[in-house]
């Protein structure tokens, strides 16, 4: 089976490696052009580009797939299928029609739930019990195509967006190999999505990560896990921005105000919420490093009665 692979970040690189190691014939890799990144804003290759070069797979980095020249190059290869994983470019209808079996997408949710840009974060923030990978036949809609294969797993209580990403990336690689094997054997049965059950995973906005202490502790804990590693759930303490990276829910009824510090010692910084409380275990001051509660308190002693608050001063 002759394959074109299109993807850009680590999530896609995991899938590319799984396909390559399974012995499938990858004719070409498409990935985004090198982009400026880091403090020096130097051009950096995508994880998919780096991997393709390691395996000596032919590589193209077009700015767009709308170009007739690019489309002609793809047609000339006569691919059986194109795999798309977090590529970042729109696939015109002309490109979708090029492979014999069309284009198939690796999507990090259980479609039709969480179509769109941020399925991992939305599943966490909404408190979903499970998530997974859907392999989808691409059409012109936004994640609306028929599902070819779906695999689910439970979201663990301490999962973050980072840990879920890694689990889903590994599962995505396994699922695309399974899909290609079934496709080669003509054993796939497409299942149309139920549009009435669909919901949209909008792109994450930094403003969403500001903690509202009047919410219950379960929701705030989900926020902290959802926005780890990006952009980091944040609050204000003594007028300074603080990011919270890890916390535990404390089930306790208390008359303290939301955001009020109940206790602060080496075991954690316990803060009252709209319902119950949170023990903050890892936090970060603006311009500083991530610190345990004990490390933070050694340099910034806190007393019961002090408050974390909402802020409009911006982000870390």
From Swiss-Prot:
InterPro entries: Fmt, Formyl_trans_C, Formyl_transf_N, Formyl_transf_N_sf, Formyl_transferase-like_C_sf, Met-tRNA-FMT_C, Met-tRNA-FMT_N. (6S)-5,6,7,8-tetrahydrofolate binds at residues 109-112. GO terms for molecular function: methionyl-tRNA formyltransferase activity. NCBIfam families: fmt (TIGR00460). One of its GO terms (cellular component) is cytosol. Belongs to the Fmt family. It is an enzyme of class 2 (transferase). Attaches a formyl group to the free amino group of methionyl-tRNA(fMet). The formyl group appears to play a dual role in the initiator identity of N-formylmethionyl-tRNA by promoting its recognition by IF2 and preventing the misappropriation of this tRNA by the elongation apparatus. It comes from Nitrosomonas eutropha (strain DSM 101675 / C91 / Nm57). Keywords: Protein biosynthesis, Transferase. It catalyses: L-methionyl-tRNA(fMet) + (6R)-10-formyltetrahydrofolate = N-formyl-L-methionyl-tRNA(fMet) + (6S)-5,6,7,8-tetrahydrofolate + H(+). This is Methionyl-tRNA formyltransferase.
């Amino acid at each position: 089976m002759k394959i074109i692979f299109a993807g850009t970040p680590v999530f896609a690189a995991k899938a590319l490696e799984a396909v390559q190691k399974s012995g499938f014939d990858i004719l070409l890799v498409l990935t985004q052009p090198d982009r400026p990144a880091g403090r020096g804003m130097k051009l950096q290759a995508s994880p998919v580009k780096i991997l393709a070069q390691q395996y000596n797979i032919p590589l193209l980095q077009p700015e767009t797939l709308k170009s007739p020249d690019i489309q002609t190059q793809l047609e000339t290869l006569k691919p059986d299928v194109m795999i798309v994983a977090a590529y970042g470019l729109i696939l015109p209808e002309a490109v979708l029609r090029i492979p014999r079996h069309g284009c198939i997408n690796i999507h990090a949710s259980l479609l039709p739930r969480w179509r769109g840009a941020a399925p991992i974060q939305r599943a966490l923030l909404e408190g979903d019990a499970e998530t997974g990978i859907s392999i989808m036949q691409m059409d012109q809609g936004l994640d609306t195509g028929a599902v070819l294969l779906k695999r689910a797993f439970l979201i663990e209580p301490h999962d973050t967006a980072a840990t879920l990403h890694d689990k889903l990336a590994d599962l995505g690689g396994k699922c695309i190999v399974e899909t290609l094997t079934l496709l080669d054997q003509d054993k796939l049965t497409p299942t149309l999505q139920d549009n009435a059950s669909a919901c949209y995973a909008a792109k994450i906005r930094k403003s969403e990560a500001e903690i509202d202490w009047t919410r219950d502790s379960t929701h705030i804990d989900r926020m902290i896990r959802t926005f780890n590693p990006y952009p980091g759930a944040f609050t204000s303490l003594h007028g300074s921005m603080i990011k919270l990276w890890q916390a535990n829910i404390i089930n306790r009824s208390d008359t303290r105000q939301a955001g009020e510090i109940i206790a602060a010692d080496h075991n954690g910084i316990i803060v009252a919420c709209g319902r119950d409380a949170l023990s903050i275990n890892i936090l970060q001051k603006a311009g500083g490093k991530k610190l345990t509660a004990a490390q933070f308190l050694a340099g910034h002693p806190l007393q019961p009665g002090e408050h974390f608050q909402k802020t409009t001063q911006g982000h870390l």
